[in-house]
Amino acid sequence: HNKIVAANGGRHPETGREKLREILMSGGDPLALPNRKVGQWMAALAEAGVESIRLGTKEMAFHPQRFDEAFLAMMDNFHETYPDVGFRLMIHFNHPDEFLLKGEDGEYLENPNGSLMWHPDTKKAIEGVTARGWIVVENQAPIIKGINDDADALRVMQRALYRAGVNNHYFFCGRDIVAYRHFNVPIEKVWNLLNESQKGLSGVEAHARLSITHYKGKTEVAAVTNEPIPGVPGTENGVLIFKILRNALDAPDRGKVCIVGRNPDAIWFDDYEDRVIYDEAGLYD
């Protein structure tokens, strides 16, 4: 693709798309593959002109020993060969219990300076990757019923991760997959949980946005209000505002919004179909 784009003035002659600048390696989990295979894929992407690689993995939570000296050596070799290619490690902690230590009383253990103590293996893994200044580490997590739908837990997690050099990237509303109504949390409740969890956090600790994935692209749940809008039908209980964050196929749509009347039981877009007030984003076309 990138070769064709370069040979045709910066756009693909059939699709009109520009070069592929950034690639997400996801799955499955790429780190279920051996280092050799991961390195080969990354090198191939770099050779194809990709400027930035993101790699999504749950291994930091499930198997932190995966980030051993052999893995780090592979990453160092890649960076030495392709120093201009950016790399982001997208990890997936859903709850602070996945990486913090607790005492017999169930409370998180503290270091002498008041910071929270990490599981040793996870601490070593995080320090191994963050010590390499060219690896950016970011966390993203879905909000899951009965698992992390708790503002206090989310606050602890965001603060502890940022202190360890991990950026808080996204929290997600659940998707409309098989049995999703059994573990998804209502959208408006998730927004309130995240908003409550970020009270008391610093600006940099509270960077995470709440995202829900529409077919048009990542969409932010930008606001939920409690008061009616005078003279506007359907706003008697307040409104929810969706905002398009990213639409790779139609970048001009970024920032466009959709306003719907509130539905406290809604867990997916179709639960708002009967209460759309304004939709410049085209979420309900």
Predicted features by range, described:
Residues 155-285:
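Auxiliary Fe-S-binding modules of radical SAM enzymes
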